[in-house]
Amino acid sequence: MAITKKNLIAFVFTILFVISYVHCRSTSDIVSGSGIKEDEHVCFKTSPCLPEVGGEKGCIAFCSRMKFTTGLCLGSVVCCCYT
């Protein structure tokens, strides 16, 4: 079976279409919803939120050491760190 110019062009366009489809699907799956990214956060049951350890400032310092942007105390034993 001979490969004609028409078949070769159809094959190349098919490959290009598949590659672009896979590329577009993989990037669009990263952004979900309306495009507004909520803050990612992690909560720790630690003592920085206790008043004698520092309270809110202690939680912020703890989160800064953990490479987060900020921290927020939930009660006196839970410190939530946000990116």
UniProtKB/Swiss-Prot annotation:
Major localization listed first in the record, in broad terms: secreted
UniProt key word Ribosomal protein: no
Keywords, in A-Z order: Antimicrobial, Disulfide bond, Fungicide, Plant defense, Secreted, Signal
Superkingdom of the source species: Eukaryota
Any one of the GO CC terms: extracellular region
Location in or out of the cell: Secreted
Protein name (database record): Putative defensin-like protein 110
Source species: Arabidopsis thaliana (Mouse-ear cress)
Family the UniProt entry places it in: Belongs to the DEFL family.
Disulphide-bonded residues: C43-C81, C49-C73, C59-C79, C63-C80
Keyword Signal on entry: yes
Signal peptide location: 1-24
GO biological process, one term: defense response to fungus
